[in-house]
């Protein structure tokens, strides 16, 4: 997200077999709490849908309650570890949203 040439936040979606993984969402500290992360996540979801993906998945840290709350507000639910992530990682939260 960029406004008047100022970068407020970034995000990335990596395509896998049938799903997209949200790889990063970062919002500049001075822009947090203004809907920037939601806008980025919504843009990534539109991209996933345009690619014909059936789900979006992500991994975030257990000590990131604001991120977890954002993802839950946007329809993500807790899921099992996926891809190359280790099962039982005590520091990770895995989430997915069916599209």
Which residues fall in each region the model found?
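C-terminal "cap" of GNAT-fold acetyltransferases
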Residues: 54-57, 61-99
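Active-site acidic-Proline motif in GNAT/NAT acetyltransferases
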Residues: 28-30, 34, 62
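Short coil/turn segments at alpha/beta junctions that flank glycine-rich nucleotide-binding fingerprints
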Residues: 34, 50-54
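Residue-level signal for short amphipathic helical patches enriched in basic/charged
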Residues: 17, 51, 59
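Structured loop/turn residues at beta-strand edges in well-structured enzyme cores
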Residues: 6, 51, 77
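Acetyl-CoA-dependent GNAT
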Residues: 1-23, 28-30, 41-43, 47, ...
């Amino acid at each position: 997200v960029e406004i008047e040439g100022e970068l407020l936040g970034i995000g990335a979606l990596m395509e896998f077999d049938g799903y997209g993984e949200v790889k990063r969402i970062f919002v500049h500290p001075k822009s947090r709490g203004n809907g920037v992360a939601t806008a980025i996540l919504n843009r990534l979801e539109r991209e996933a849908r345009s690619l014909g993906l059936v789900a979006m998945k992500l991994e975030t840290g257990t000590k990131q309650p604001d991120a977890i709350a954002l993802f839950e507000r946007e329809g993500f639910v807790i899921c099992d570890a996926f891809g190359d992530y280790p099962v039982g990682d005590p520091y990770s939260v895995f989430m997915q949203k069916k599209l």
